[in-house]
Amino acid sequence: MSLHHVKTNKYKGFYDSYASPPATKEISKYSLKEESNKPEVIRDLIIDELLLDGNAKQNLATFCQTDLDKEIHVLMDKCIDKNMIDKDEYPQTAEIESRCVHILADLWNSPESSETIGCSTTGSSEAAMLGGMALKWRWRENRKKQGKPFDKPNIVTGPVQICWHKFALYFDIELREVPMEHDRYIMTPEEAIKRCDENTIGVIPTLGVTFTLQYEDVKGISEALDKFEKETGLDIPIHVDAASGGFVAPFLQPEIVWDFRLPRVKSINGSGHKFGLSPLGVGWVVWRGKNDIHKDLVFDVNYLGGNMPTFSLNFSRPGGQIVCQYYNFLRHGRSGYTAVHQACLDHGIFISKQVKKHGIFDIVYDGTGALPGACWKLKKDAKVKFNLFDLSDRMRNRGWQIASYTLPNLPDIVVQRVLIRHGFSHDMAMLLIEDFNRSIEYFDKHPMVQSISKDEGQSFHH
């Protein structure tokens, strides 16, 4: 037998992420240490930590898009170093943004979409605030011309997303929010008009209320404001918060008149990263015309040797989400968006029907006529051994994230809501219902001694 002499230790070059520092000791989480580390080790440690987040596929609480084409990942990688604000440095990205604005203007029935003004934002919240700022500046200018005081502006809304509360606080505006009632969960034309006066800068109906998924009656509110103007002479504009519905109604409910077909609608905001199917970080706001934005709010930047007007609250921000929005417009078209959202709507209807079969739930929203999803509450006389917070908590054992929360102004009413987005199949809906049924059976066999309180179990509903 031959003898071989080993000159070096063959294990000397051994390397493994989990057998090397810092994986073999506690890492510094809250202060920056002196030493550096191998990138692949840190990457693996962070990926492991992210596994503790919920499974996006089973997150039926969020409105944000979580199922993305592989092509979107490629485009996002190509745009990772593009700063959207540098329109002179990235002129083609700026051109793509402009195309998206005109596509949306056309989708939302702007009378002259080629002349429409609008912009991208970091999300629908920023877009909503820009729309609100334009309303305030327009109202203030008119009050100055009339020689009237302009120190007490107000907006009239239904049960709105938190961004409108922030807008009112940050920009010193009174928020007149129509409260929910036991027999009414959204703003009606009658309730809106009750709160309007000469200091109202605008009425803000929501196309897809976050709490119940329902659409508010934009056309009815517009007609009520027309009548109000004839009686009082007050011309009050409408800004539509279409964060979710703006990318659903044009495809699934084209018969609903809510957009620029109504002359009183001066601006609309929408979220590209919700039902626009784009990755997180893109919103849109479109105005009916240039006169609906006060000139003092607009800044000019150099663009292709000329000037481009800009209006935003942010400065540096990534361009990838805008490019991906353009990709989605080209990739899906009207027929694609219709097919995708119709499938989601059908799943929501299926879920609401299955939930109703238990006989212990009142269906607040059955999945028809508005956003894809469903919403329900326990019947007042339901003889059950759990509350909806308990049910949500039990469903988490199987990975499902379902929002349960009390309604604003109605702390005695707890609702549970599922929001259906692209990437959710009928098989997933059936699995959800199977786990839902098993959870209720579990509580029948194992009654809750101490139910989860609303403070402990309140879910994020936006």
From Swiss-Prot:
* One term under GO cellular component: cytosol
Entry EC number(s): 4.1.1.15
Expression by tissue: Exclusively expressed in prespore cells late in development.
Q: What's in the keyword line of the UniProt record?
A: Lyase, Pyridoxal phosphate
Q: Which GO terms describe its molecular function?
A: glutamate decarboxylase activity; pyridoxal phosphate binding
What GO biological process terms are annotated to this protein in UniProt?
A: glutamate catabolic process
Q: What happens when the gene is disrupted?
A: Mutant cells grow and develop well, forming normally proportioned fruiting bodies, but the number of viable spores is reduced to about half.
Annotated pyridoxal 5'-phosphate binding lies at 124-125, 210, 273
Report the residues modified as N6-(pyridoxal phosphate)lysine: 274
Cofactor section: pyridoxal 5'-phosphate
Q: Which residues bind substrate?
A: 62, 83
Concerning Pfam families, the annotation shows:
Pyridoxal_deC
Per the UniProt entry, the disulfide pairs are none
What reaction(s) does this enzyme catalyze?
Answer: L-glutamate + H(+) = 4-aminobutanoate + CO2
Its biological function? Answer: Generates GABA from glutamate. GABA induces the release of acbA from prespore cells and induces the exposure of tagC on the surface of prestalk cells where it can convert acbA to SDF-2. Glutamate acts as a competitive inhibitor.
Complexes and interactors: Homohexamer.
Q: Which family does it belong to?
A: Belongs to the group II decarboxylase family.
Q: What name does this protein carry?
A: Glutamate decarboxylase A
Q: Organism classification, top ranks?
A: Eukaryota, Amoebozoa, Evosea, Eumycetozoa, Dictyostelia
